[in-house]
Regions:
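A mature extracytoplasmic/lumenal domain signature
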Residues: 47, 56, 66, 158-160, ...
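Beta-rich nucleic-acid/ligand-interaction surfaces
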Residues: 208-214, 304-311
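Peripheral terminal and inter-domain segments
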Residues: 9-120
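K/E-rich alpha-helical interaction surfaces of small helical-bundle regulatory domains
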Residues: 28-40, 289-293, 300, 305
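Sterically constrained small-residue positions within well-ordered secondary structures
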Residues: 5, 25, 34, 43, ...
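Extracytoplasmic cell-surface/polysaccharide-interacting catalytic and binding patches
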Residues: 105-202, 217-299, 308-323
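Bacterial N-terminal signal peptides
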Residues: 1-9
Length: 323
């Protein structure tokens, strides 16, 4: 109770440092991942300095010697003392590493070419039945968090063409969760509000037939990106939410280490790259939601599962029929 009271007064969650300064804009084009045939070297900003990380070595701070030349704080990777940045690559000693294109630009979206017509799949899969389940499940009680707290906003990508299939999938831009999960999200929003942040939901309850559409439309080699409809997903149970933070003062989404729905290492919940502020935003979101007993998906910093998801069964109710 004491910790919650402190949060409601605008204090940061335990173990979270103060909000870092914005990284110098000149460094943003240098930050990223660079690869040779054998290694991947990450360049990121931490505490107002550029840092180079080549695992299993410890991170090494860089000092700027010229516009595109930095020196290591000690003997660097490949026994080098400096790192030179060039368009599309870096040189560390005698080793040249090419810059990896890790994902879409800020605000962009992963795209796949559907192998079947999404419109046709929506018509067909809508009529199918989810896999049978047995157990003592709780009765479904789906509610809309945005109706419980006015600071919770929506950017439902599957109700637009700005999603991985490039096609509208949802019939309306709505987000439902089982009531206990929705109330937990409202409590999280109340914690974030004094800190100047609100919650922006990208997806929540997903009818099972939509999961089937995703599976059927996705190329087989890329199906690791989507849930298997034979097992259903936590989204189908109304117990998972995809979300980020937005700035209450401007209404703009905050910067995170990756874009939403990005299928690259930047999406990992512990990805070390990016800027201090991006990682701080990610950590703030995670700390506040974990305090409400959500669990982050290690592969997707934006995806959180509610603690009691196993107690709810797979649902296939269209948004318009949710009562």
């Amino acid at each position: 109770m004491i910790a919650l009271a402190l949060l409601l007064q605008g204090s940061l969650p335990d173990s979270l440092p103060p909000k870092p300064a914005v990284a110098p804009s000149a460094w943003l084009s240098l930050i990223g991942a660079y690869a040779s045939d054998h290694d991947t070297l990450y360049v990121y900003e931490d505490g107002g300095a550029l840092v180079a990380l080549l695992r299993p070595r410890a991170p090494m701070r860089l000092a700027q010697a010229a516009e595109s030349l930095f020196t290591f704080s000690g003997r660097g990777p490949y026994d080098a003392d400096r790192i030179a940045f060039r368009p599309g690559e870096i040189q560390v000693g005698q080793v040249v590493l090419r810059r990896l294109q890790m994902g879409p630009a800020d605000g962009g979206q992963l795209r796949l070419q559907p192998v079947r017509s999404v419109t046709e799949l929506l018509r067909i899969d809508h009529k199918l039945t989810p896999p049978a389940e047995t157990g003592a499940f709780l009765a479904p009680d789906l509610v809309e968090p945005s109706r419980l707290d006015g600071t919770i906003r929506l950017d439902i990508r599957y109700a637009t063409t700005n999603n991985f299939l490039g096609t509208v999938v949802y019939s309306s831009a709505r987000a439902f969760l089982q009531r206990p999960a929705a109330l937990a999200l409202v409590r999280a929003a109340r914690v974030l509000r004094p800190l100047g942040y609100g919650i922006l939901i990208h997806d929540a309850y997903r009818p099972w037939y939509v999961t089937k559409v995703f599976w059927d439309a996705t190329p087989p080699a890329s199906r690791w990106l989507v849930a298997d409809p034979a097992r259903g997903s936590k989204h189908n149970r109304g117990a998972a939410v995809d979300l980020t933070l937005y700035d209450l003062a401007t209404g703009a989404p905050v910067e995170m280490p990756s874009t939403y729905d990005e299928a690259t290492p930047r999406a990992l919940s512990d990805y070390p790259g990016g800027t201090s502020r991006q990682r701080w935003h990610r950590a703030l979101l995670r700390r506040v939601l974990e305090a409400e007993r959500f669990t982050v998906n290690p592969s997707e910093w934006w995806h959180f599962d509610f603690r009691d998801w196993q107690r709810y069964q797979i649902l296939n109710v269209p948004f318009e029929r949710v009562r």
